[in-house]
């Protein structure tokens, strides 16, 4: 673990710490349940003018197998399955990101580029040495980051070039870009990584390995653990458990979040469903 090294990170932590202290215990209000999906792993909110959808990656098989069974479903924001197989020809698609009309999807050892308007696969970028590509995050300039949970790396795709951006990131999974920084889920730890690759621990002690990360504003995060846990995480390290569905066998995989409606979308993986909740903070 690299200790806090920069004044910039220290200032960011202290300012967000004060904001986070003001938050009361958040709660969830269930809005809807969309069923009939095929092992949904990740949900991405897509808003572009009047075009508003949820993209849902569907593994439809083993998460590590090249079988051609994977696809992307398209749902309305109200939970209607608009296109159950909007794009097909994938293997085990997981994390997604959007930049300039393209949907980028992690798929075992590839980054698949899909044109959103035509719903056609345009390109497949093979990541050398990749074994289990998982989450994707894209910054405002189009730099893409993708985690590999099996090799403990975060790869970067920038200006047509791929490299290993971070190494020795235990069970690297969830990613989220916050300004110039990258938030990374590494096993049961949540880190903030600055441009100099200094790592600041935001929170630790999650009961299971981190899967999805979403910024909820004012320095707070929603963090899911695949096994069936959803946390509200404050920048001061305080964690509020919102969902524990482990005993029921209801997974909480790579979540999506709509900041306009304060809605979190939870893919339930083996239950073949997505559940939407309103996040209520007082």
Please report, for each region that a protein language model flagged, where it lies by residue.
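Bacterial N-terminal signal peptides
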Residues: 8-19
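A short beta-strand motif characteristic of beta-propeller blades
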Residues: 28-34, 80-87, 120-126, 161-167, ...
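Beta-rich, blade/repeat-based domains predominating
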Residues: 37-51, 68-69, 87-102, 108, ...
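Beta-propeller domains
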Residues: 56-78
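Short glycine/acidic-enriched loop and turn motifs that connect beta-strands
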Residues: 60-64, 151-152, 189-191, 271-273
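WD40 beta-propeller blade core
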Residues: 73, 112-113, 155, 191-192, ...
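Short loop/turn segments that connect beta-strands within beta-propeller blades
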Residues: 76-79, 115-120, 157-161, 194-198, ...
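Blade-level signature of beta-propeller repeat domains, shared across WD40, Kelch, NHL, RCC1
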Residues: 254-282
